[in-house]
Every structure is written in C-alpha cells, then in structure tokens.
C-alpha cells in the first residue's frame, strides 16, 4: 500500500482582507514547499475566488463550510456546486466552531459530508472533544460518535481527510502532546479498521489540529499516525511554510 501523503490544511477562519491575504499568498507562492506534502488553504467564502485565482495551482483551496443541497432558499449558505464553480476542490466540514458556536449537529454534518462528496469535493471532516469531555474520560466515546456520523455518509474514502481537533487545544495555546495526539489518532485508525475496512484505515489520512506552530510541528509530524495538520492562526503567518515542511 502506498504511504499516506502528508496533508497540511490552513484554516484562515474569519480573518484577512485582500491586502493581507494577497501578501500571504505571495509568500506561499514564492516558498519552497515539499513536493511530498499536499497543501490546501481554507479561505473565507467571499475570498475563495480571489484565493483560487492568486494561489499557485499546486496549492489547493477549501471552503470553510457548505450546505447539504445544491441550491435553493438558504440565505447566507453556499453549495458544493458553487465551490467547484470557482475552481476550489475542498471543503472543511464539522469544525468545532461550526459545532459549538453555530450549533451544527452530528446529523447535519453527516448530511453535508454526503452531499459534498456526491458533488465531487474533497472533505476535511473534523472531530474532537471538549475539555470537560477529556477530563471526564470520554474522549473516545465522543470522537467515535462524531466519526460514525461522518462514516455513515461516506462511500468512497479516497476524498476524505479526517481532522482530529481537541477543542480545548484550538486557539488556546494548549497543544495536545505528540503522545496524546498519537494515542487518539491510533484509536481512530483502529475504529476505521473495525467499522469500515482495513484498507480504508491504512489509506485515510488523519491529521491533527489544535495550536500547531512552527515550534511544535516537527515532533507532532514524527508520530506514526499523524498524517498532517489543520492549522489555524499559524496558517496566516510565514511560519505556515515551516509547518508544511515539517516532515522534511
């Protein structure tokens, strides 16, 4: 089986403007990025077209969310068809901010995943526990339930990247230790093996998100079951290049 290609996603969240994002894109386009790493930038929806036009073709573009149907009376939403129409190929779904700030349920996220995949987008599907859940010892229960809601809606796993993001580590400066990340990633791979297939477990990339920086990325990347990162704040800074090249 081919080794899993390292995957680094940058989630710009609700940040940036044409000037600052243009400068960031200029930095990324001019940087020497490892050819062995797949790179995708998640732009705010209003800048998706701008990002796709300005970024080198070798860097992918992701929307940060989408809805579960192709079109209709859903004010404020965008569809996978629209994302594809401007040339972007990915979408981030189930991010903890969508779950906890905007109240998206496991069921809705599963429906969105199903529709995005049916429309031909790649999906970065996010899961992760909150601090009280980790302290209560139910990390596995929470992430397995979230993973099941996604897995029930996936027929072809080749377009899915699973992103484990412990909610207590997102934007807090707290990072799961490399050992904590590896432990959950290994359990997730075991869940895929038991509930989907061994082939899917071996080939699906499981990436880590949660205060990843240029300083901690190398040790995280060295873990056997960590296949890349979903990077928040640091993806808006030049150190994003160091994170992309963490394996090299």
Curated annotation (Swiss-Prot):
A GO cellular component annotation in the UniProt record: cytosol
Catalytic activity: dihydroxyacetone phosphate = methylglyoxal + phosphate; D-glyceraldehyde 3-phosphate = dihydroxyacetone phosphate
Keyword RNA-binding applies: no
UniProt keyword terms in alphabetical order: Cytoplasm, Gluconeogenesis, Glycolysis, Isomerase, Lyase
CDD domains: TIM (cd00311)
Subcellular location: Cytoplasm
Primary localization class, coarse: cytoplasm
GO biological process: canonical glycolysis; gluconeogenesis; glyceraldehyde-3-phosphate biosynthetic process; glycerol catabolic process; glycolytic process; methylglyoxal biosynthetic process
Active site (UniProt): 95 (electrophile), 165 (proton acceptor)
Disulfide bond found in the keyword field: no
Protein name as it appears in the record: Triosephosphate isomerase
Source organism of this protein record: Gallus gallus (Chicken)
Phylogenetic lineage: Eukaryota, Metazoa, Chordata, Craniata, Vertebrata
């Amino acid at each position: 089986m081919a080794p899993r290609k390292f995957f680094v996603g940058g989630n710009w969240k609700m940040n940036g403007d044409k000037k600052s994002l243009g400068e960031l894109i200029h930095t990324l386009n001019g940087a020497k990025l490892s050819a062995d790493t797949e790179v995708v930038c998640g732009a705010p929806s209003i800048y998706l077209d701008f990002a796709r036009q300005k970024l080198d073709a070798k860097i992918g573009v992701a929307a940060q969310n989408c809805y579960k149907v192709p079109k209709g009376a859903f004010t404020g939403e965008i569809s996978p068809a629209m994302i594809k129409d401007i040339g972007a190929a990915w979408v981030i779904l189930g991010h903890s901010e969508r779950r906890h700030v905007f109240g998206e349920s496991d069921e809705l996220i599963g429906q969105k995943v199903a529709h995005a995949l049916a429309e031909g987008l790649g999906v970065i599907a996010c899961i992760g526990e909150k601090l009280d859940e980790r302290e209560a010892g139910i990390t596995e229960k929470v992430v397995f339930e979230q993973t099941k809601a996604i897995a029930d809606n996936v027929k072809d796993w080749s377009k899915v990247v699973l992103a484990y993001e412990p909610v207590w580590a997102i934007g807090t400066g707290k990072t799961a230790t490399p050992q904590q990340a590896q432990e959950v990633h290994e359990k997730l791979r075991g869940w895929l093996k038991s509930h989907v297939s061994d082939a899917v477990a071996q080939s699906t990339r499981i990436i880590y998100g949660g205060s990843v920086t240029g300083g901690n990325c190398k040790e995280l990347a060295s873990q056997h079951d960590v296949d890349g990162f979903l990077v928040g704040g640091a993806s808006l800074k030049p150190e994003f290049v160091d994170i992309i090249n963490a394996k090299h």
